[in-house]
Amino acid sequence: MKVIFLKDVKGKGKKGEVKNVPDGYANNFLLKQGLAAEATNSSMKTLEAQKRKEEKDAAAEVENAKELKETLEKLTVEVKAKSGEGGRLFGSITSKQIVDAMQKSHKIKLDKRKFEMDDAIRALGYTNVTVKLHPQVTATVKVHVSEQ
């Protein structure tokens, strides 16, 4: 019997896959548990439409990330901090502080976990920080740390 998997089934198939499985296995387990649906013409058309919609949504997500990247790369985020002699900061600037500064000055809200910083910023001046907006889109934000 041909079935469309509605959920991942270990050793049998992944969600959205169409496979031939034994009739008894399909009727007694997959269909009863709601793990699969019988592959009829209408359900195949529904599956195709769903796949097209998911691809369209994914493409739109990448486009939005690219637009945000262009916006972010034009910006300079100003962060003020207390510093000692030689331009060393008392403490450091973390991704959370950068996100807060962006929210205040540019009204752009990002998740602090998207910032890829090896270490926190510990000196005055300009620093480039990478932001992973999407698995395929990475932006660079210019952060200017000035004395308070």
Swiss-Prot record:
Family: Belongs to the bacterial ribosomal protein bL9 family.
GO terms assigned for molecular function: rRNA binding; structural constituent of ribosome
Keywords: Ribonucleoprotein, Ribosomal protein, RNA-binding, rRNA-binding
Record GO biological process: translation
Name of this protein: Large ribosomal subunit protein bL9
Record SUPFAM superfamilies: L9 N-domain-like, Ribosomal protein L9 C-domain
Record gene name: rplI
Annotated organism of origin: Bacillus cereus (strain G9842)
Source organism superkingdom: Bacteria
Family annotation (InterPro entries): Ribosomal_bL9, Ribosomal_bL9/RNase_H1_N, Ribosomal_bL9_bac/chp, Ribosomal_bL9_C, Ribosomal_bL9_C_sf, Ribosomal_bL9_N, Ribosomal_bL9_N_sf
The UniProt record lists the keyword Ribonucleoprotein: yes
Matches recorded under Pfam families: Ribosomal_L9_C (PF03948), Ribosomal_L9_N (PF01281)
Keyword field contains rRNA-binding: yes
Role description: Binds to the 23S rRNA.
Recorded GO CC terms: ribonucleoprotein complex; ribosome
